[in-house]
Amino acid sequence: MWITTTPWSKHSPNWVLADNGEKLIVPEIILGDAQGPTRNEWYIGLSSVLGFSFWSPDYDGVGTWLDAATQLNEQGGGDVITYSSGAHIVRTLLLAASQSNVHSTFTSKALGNDQTSSMTSSTTAVTVAKSGDGQQQTGEQKEEDWKDISKADLFKDDPYVLKNFGDSTTQAKMQSGGSTNSNGNGSQASLAFTKKALSLLKFLVDNKILKKDKVKEAIMNPDQYLSKRSKLDSNNQKPTKDDFIGSEFKDLYENAAKLNRFNSIWAEKDTDNAKFLITVVDSYFPVLPVPAAGLNETSPTLLKPWFQFRSAPSGNGTIRDYGFIPENK
């Protein structure tokens, strides 16, 4: 179901949801908390009432949101945000590279023998230096164009991919709420999306965020990783404290804690790179944002049925999926 939010200030009504027993969204107006935290406090604390929405208006410095939303700890679990999108990005990259028309080309170009790998990785490995003002700087690097790959249809029916990577006709249909079939438009969008996924996957391997040998193993048989989460989600296996969100990929990481940093570096290299990451994160973590100071337009959001309220200093702030949060066990 769709719901539209409207601009809000500390003294205007706020929106919450009430459970009417029929699992329907019922808006209820309550007074906003005039003594609540400032928007800067919300933002710095990564508890924005926007609900981590990447496609709605938000505060200045939107580029840092992608970094924060994909941050992992050293074990590969959510760090600041328990329900981190970092693991979903890795999952998407593995699925893209495991396509039958893709994995052999990707393996030979990005995960080949040590000599080949050392020659190709030099084009995407990043050297980070500090400028005189202390700001981190990265050099311009060449990115593989994957011309040898002409078909990759795995994502041709994904509405997020069609909306952001389809041709102008397809994007217009998706923006207007229409539908599109799995024709050439979907195939074109899926191919463009897949190539971006391959570039990011190679970038993360070259910069030693992901282990090359484990990635090679995973794209040959992704189910050995994906099936671990499927068993938990289907209640066929009781979760333990080690079954944190994204735990199925923990063996793939060489430096999980820097995944978000290198996602941001890669996103800065090209507008379509950023669009790829935003597409992946949005498709994984749609939430219901409540209105906040700074919004200047309406923002419709699809709410997943298993999302629950997350308490906040100024009341119910965002809808979150508690998932396998350790402190709730």
UniProtKB/Swiss-Prot annotation:
Renumbered to this chain, region (Disordered) spans 109-147
Q: Which domain of life is it from?
A: Bacteria
Record field: compositional bias (Low complexity): 116-131
Which is a Pfam family this sequence falls into? Answer: DUF5396
Stated family: To the C-terminal of MG321/MPN_456.
Q: Which protein, by its recorded name, is this?
A: Uncharacterized protein MPN_457
Q: Which organism is it from?
A: Mycoplasma pneumoniae (strain ATCC 29342 / M129 / Subtype 1) (Mycoplasmoides pneumoniae)
Q: Highest lineage ranks of the organism?
A: Bacteria, Bacillati, Mycoplasmatota, Mycoplasmoidales, Mycoplasmoidaceae
